[in-house]
Amino acid sequence: MPIKRLAIYTLLAAIIAATSALIVRQAVIDNVPQWVMKLIQDRMADGGDRWNTCSHTRTYGPVHGGVSRANPDSMVSVMAYDLSRGPVRVSGETWPNYWSLSLYQDNTDNYFVINDRELETSSFDFIISYDDEVDPAEQAQHITSPTETGVMVIRRFVRSSDELPAVLANQDKMYCGPVTTGS
């Protein structure tokens, strides 16, 4: 085989390999975040029975023999939401030491964050919707999600285990669920 033909075949093979690598790379970048978020949402929603409801961390401090939390001094409330079922309300009282609410769309992008220092009062009332489907008479702060599904995370900083009963009561007073009259 002449060297010229071998060089052309080698160049074509390199172009095909590079193009294939770019296509695979882009497919991974475009799809892996959604796959990861779907796994997280399914785990949080317990296979579909707990969409649009909150789950709460009920223990304080490091977890011995279990999966470590990012911050053992944080008591966390989480919710996997599905707005195809309608808007979702999240309301309650903040926590005096530190409180924050973060919302993530279905590709893991964080699209909304607020903490207790940004609120005018110690209570919060948010309605999360898709496509601005909220009754204008609602007095809650309206947040439009860029995707129909996502995840909400509320973090509370707890200084010691002595605060555990109070933070558990704070979590239990929260409302996470569909927007209904009087919710």
Predicted regions and their residues:
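A compositional/structural signature for long, glycine/proline-rich flexible linkers
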Residues: M1-S183
